[in-house]
Structures are given as structure tokens and as C-alpha cells.
């Protein structure tokens, strides 16, 4: 069961770190920037250069969802690295919450935010027309991806400096979402774009 007191404490921990604070709200800024680009810049490019970027909106949406997941995954990874330094996980193991409860509360923090941000991104940008169940599925997948990124950072890095380097490498995986543009079908991370295409 998710303990909302722990989530409140997680927010306090995030706000004490400038990097995590920026990463927590950066998805909203990214959504706003791309909305402005879609409304003002993309029509200008289509008129001026006769290049229709709307053909690539599916890839744009997939990239934004992966970017949001990656950022929130870094946040949860950094929080768990802080806990590792302070031996918080070991202390939680002897409390009624337990180690499994600690992990559920930690990982739910990023996955819930990622779920909410993903829904906001899809509705605010409004560049794809997909059923509501597809939006829910994509948002859930984004939340799961953020958990995976966070756990990989936690398991592969000893401190935040190494964690940031590790995170950059992990988030490079997002480029595989655009492999369909190069007709390289052997790339594995293509499900987000294919879900959009199958929903049309």
C-alpha cells in the first residue's frame, strides 16, 4: 500500500536538491515548449519550406513520452542513491514498512508522476488521435519505463555523479524509438511508435 506521508517526505527530499527539482518539473516545461512549436513554428516551416512535420507527430509524441519517463527515472534513481548513502534502505528493512514497502513507495513516486505527465502531454499537445484505453496503456508503459531507469541507475551507480553519467547513457536508448524512420526493424525499442500506428 502506498503511504502518502512517505510521498510527502519524498517531495521534501527532491526540493532540497536543485537537479532533482529541475528534473521533476522539466516535463511540464518540455510540454509547453513543444506545444508552442506545434502551434507557431511547425505551420511556418510547412508554409515557408513546404515540409509537413505533421507526418512525424507520432514519433514526436513517442520521443516526448520517453523523455518524460527518463527524467523522472533519474529523479527516483537519485533519491535511492541518497538513501543508499544514508543507509535508509537498511533502516527501513527493520520497520513495519519493510524493504518491499520501501521500494513500492519509492518507485510509485516516479511512476504516478510519469503516468500523470504522460496523460497531460498527450492531451495538451493533441497531435495524435488514439482511443482513451491506448492513452492509459501508453501512460502505464511510461511509468514502468521510469521505474526501470531508476532501478538501473540505482544498481549501476555509486553516487550522483556516476548516476548522472549512467542516466545519460540509459536515456540514449530513447533514440531507438525512431528506428522506424531508418527501416531498421531489428531495433528492439519500437513499441511506442507501433502502438500509435496500430491505433490509427
PLM segments and residue spans:
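Hydrophobic alpha-helical interface/terminus motif in multipass membrane transporters
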Residues: 80, 89-92, 124, 153, ...
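Hydrophobic alpha-helical transmembrane segments of multi-pass membrane transport proteins
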Residues: 56-94, 99-121
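Hydrophobic alpha-helical transmembrane segments
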Residues: 21-24, 60-61, 104, 108, ...
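Secretory targeting signals
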Residues: 110-151, 155-156
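N-terminal Sec/SRP start-transfer signal
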Residues: 1-21
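Terminal transmembrane helical anchor/hairpin motif
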Residues: 40-41, 46-53, 179-200
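Hydrophobic alpha-helical transmembrane segments of multi-pass membrane transport/permease proteins
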Residues: 16-43, 59-75, 168-179
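A structural motif at transmembrane helix-loop-helix junctions in multipass membrane proteins
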Residues: 140-181
